[in-house]
Amino acid sequence: MTAKRGIGRHESLADKIQRHRGIILVISVPIVLIGLVLLLMPGRSISDSVVEEYSVHNRKGGPNSRGPKNYAVIFDAGSSGSRVHVYCFDQNLDLIPLGNELELFLQLKPGLSAYPTDPRQAANSLVSLLDKAEASVPRELRPKTHVRVGATAGLRTLGHDASENILQAVRELLRDRSMLKTEANAVTVLDGTQEGSYQWVTINYLLRNLGKPYSDTVGVVDLGGGSVQMAYAISEEDAASAPKPLEGEDSYVREMYLKGRKYFLYVHSYLHYGLLAARAEILKVSEDSENPCIVAGYDGMYKYGGKEFKAPASQSGASLDECRRITINALKVNDTLCTHMKCTFGGVWNGGRGGGQKNMFVASFFFDRAAEAGFVDPKQPVATVRPMDFEKAAKKACSMKLEEGKSTFPLVEEENLPYLCMDLVYQYTLLIDGFGLEPSQTITLVKKVKYGDQAVEAAWPLGSAIEAVSSP
């Protein structure tokens, strides 16, 4: 029989451990396991934290690229082709890169207006652009991402029924094929003031001018295929004195509230005076006879807006002076048509030509023809020129023969060579006689605008995207 411990006996440490060994085992096992887990985890030094913070704050999209994102998909259905732009914005309306670029931009030819009698084929021409654009938007965000199709002047020239049939086919394509969000007015023909004001917003947004006084913004001339738009900010006083537009015409002034400041934007769109449409207007002046704007050696037909126009060159070749004369005629540069104090051409009020017009950015076909004519670098997104540079290039183009065209102007597409004299003369005449610029005045030709360390296409769709993501 084992004797009991005496009540007064002193218990050693070994005896205590022996007596409580079960409890100690239960406590020690989890502690050991936790220690092993911590030991096996990778270490994180102070320098690691600094590197991660630096990379977040110095990536192209900035610190907000991890926050909420809004995408917008904008189709530009122009007269010379269809284009799609995909943009991504953070909560501050700053652009976030898509891959290595600040936008996804894709284009193809011909445009919707090339299918005036086949709406379904017109809509299907957008399928490849739509699929690639939608694939760039995260799947979970597609139902919240606005898609817009803005048809411009080329479709307007087809007439209401033909253009509406094409637009309806595009609506059905988006409904049946896309997860993107379409509103009731998502597919439409843009009116001239929309196109011009969106372009103005785009360029001034990229230049970070929005929020500044109107005189610190830049004016914009956008020469498309079917129409040309002029837009610039004017004073409240000039806006108040703006003449009322004729019946059926758009208002001369749009009020826009951007970045905390109200702007009064003069904007006008000249339908039939885009570069491709203007060719038809100039050919109409000479009717079916020889035209002094056509390069020597050409005798063909010019097709535009579903119509054909005879385009025979003069036997003596093109003439810059004679081409200028009939171009001024086509522009209707005639003071008797002007019922206002100041006009551009065709009896249109010019907006007063205040501070918002002192710096002019000129886009689209102005840049393209200047690059093809060789007096700006096509690889550079921006170039500073003077209107007289177009006249100088026109002299060269008007004096050549058609067979010399490819060697003289290697960057010009063959189908455009017969009309190169006409295009350059028209652009010079539009700037000088139409918009009243001085021949030696400095203007900025713009293809893309630098935004941070990226270059963004200087086109109206970005302005439309800003409006889309700002709407509820």
Curated annotation (Swiss-Prot):
<keyword id="KW-0472">Membrane</keyword>
<protein>
    <recommendedName>
        <fullName>Apyrase 2</fullName>
        <ecNumber>3.6.1.5</ecNumber>
    </recommendedName>
</protein>
<dbReference type="InterPro" id="IPR000407">
    <property type="entry name" value="GDA1_CD39_NTPase"/>
</dbReference>
<feature type="binding site">
    <location>
        <begin position="73"/>
        <end position="83"/>
    </location>
    <ligand>
        <name>ATP</name>
    </ligand>
</feature>
<keyword id="KW-0547">Nucleotide-binding</keyword>
<keyword id="KW-1133">Transmembrane helix</keyword>
<feature type="topological domain" description="Lumenal">
    <location>
        <begin position="43"/>
        <end position="472"/>
    </location>
</feature>
<feature type="topological domain" description="Cytoplasmic">
    <location>
        <begin position="1"/>
        <end position="21"/>
    </location>
</feature>
<feature type="binding site">
    <location>
        <begin position="219"/>
        <end position="229"/>
    </location>
    <ligand>
        <name>ATP</name>
    </ligand>
</feature>
<dbReference type="Pfam" id="PF01150">
    <property type="entry name" value="GDA1_CD39"/>
</dbReference>
<keyword id="KW-0067">ATP-binding</keyword>
<keyword id="KW-0106">Calcium</keyword>
<feature type="glycosylation site" description="N-linked (GlcNAc...) asparagine">
    <location>
        <position position="334"/>
    </location>
</feature>
<dbReference type="GO" id="GO:0005524">
    <property type="term" value="F:ATP binding"/>
</dbReference>
<keyword id="KW-0325">Glycoprotein</keyword>
<keyword id="KW-0812">Transmembrane</keyword>
<dbReference type="GO" id="GO:0000139">
    <property type="term" value="C:Golgi membrane"/>
</dbReference>
<feature type="active site" description="Proton acceptor">
    <location>
        <position position="195"/>
    </location>
</feature>
<keyword id="KW-0333">Golgi apparatus</keyword>
<keyword id="KW-0378">Hydrolase</keyword>
<feature type="transmembrane region" description="Helical; Signal-anchor for type II membrane protein">
    <location>
        <begin position="22"/>
        <end position="42"/>
    </location>
</feature>
<keyword id="KW-0735">Signal-anchor</keyword>
<dbReference type="GO" id="GO:0004050">
    <property type="term" value="F:apyrase activity"/>
</dbReference>
<comment type="similarity">
    <text>Belongs to the GDA1/CD39 NTPase family.</text>
</comment>
<comment type="function">
    <text>Catalyzes the hydrolysis of phosphoanhydride bonds of nucleoside tri- and di-phosphates. Substrate preference is ATP &gt; ADP. Functions with APY1 to reduce extracellular ATP level which is essential for pollen germination and normal plant development. Plays a role in the regulation of stomatal function by modulating extracellular ATP levels in guard cells.</text>
</comment>
